[in-house]
């Protein structure tokens, strides 16, 4: 049975005059349609993901295609049971993806070769190839291509510095890079070329497109793909499912992300429902005892209940040491 909602994912590097004015107009239009989602607009283009009914998303796509700037923009479509967002944001930003380079990269001028899923799949298996995940560490930890390098970064803007520190491992290699939908790799692969790396390619359409390819069927992907909406993750490999995520507290296989209940921390943790309960969705003792702990507020916990939970954790910690 066809689902009644869809999630759209798209981007286009294209010059947008008066982006702040276009941002306000686009927000109004999206709200009128009843869409929910997050869209970034800058002078260098548009990068968005929205959810809505089939009818709403169809109207939205038709409007985008009617604009000469976005007429040839690929739009990835996922069926959904309902909205994947809670609100509608359209924001103006200086960059579509934040790299803060002194010498900025224009992907329309300099970017890596685009590889279709089958070509990417075959190139990954070349022993002279190195595959770099251009996403954040918490995205990698939930799922990644088999054998891909995990840059130790918490934000995309940290990636160039990480590459500079590890450039020896890339010397003489064919470089493949990938991200969720492709927007980050457009700039990152261009930056690699500017830094003198000669053989640089990127996964055309990103992980999302790779998982939908009827021939490759997501093979050589392990785990789930992290997405920035209420779904949190989506499947990729349609041939075999290998769980690589590990529970933050116990290390057991898990693919469920939560955020630390201390708003000042908000650390992303892979965590089972049982351990979310046991540890009050908090990454540390300091976060569990923080006066602003959201888990405590959500469950209306009394101080007695909090103390009982803390005592149990302390008892088990001592037992583990002994």
Curated annotation (Swiss-Prot):
Catalysed reaction equations from the record: uridine(34) in tRNA + AH2 + O2 = 5-hydroxyuridine(34) in tRNA + A + H2O
One MF term in the entry's GO annotations: oxidoreductase activity, acting on paired donors, with incorporation or reduction of molecular oxygen
Database matches in Pfam families: Rhodanese (PF00581), Rhodanese_C (PF12368), UPF0176_N (PF17773)
CDD domains associated with the record: RHOD_YceA (cd01518)
Domain of life: Bacteria
EC number: 1.14.-.-
Record-annotated active site: 179 (cysteine persulfide intermediate)
Cysteine-cysteine disulfides: none
UniProt KW Oxidoreductase keyword: yes
Keyword Oxidoreductase: yes
Rhodanese domain location: 125-219
Keywords assigned: Oxidoreductase, tRNA processing
GO biological process: tRNA modification
Role played: Catalyzes oxygen-dependent 5-hydroxyuridine (ho5U) modification at position 34 in tRNAs.
Membership in a protein family: Belongs to the TrhO family.
Protein name: tRNA uridine(34) hydroxylase
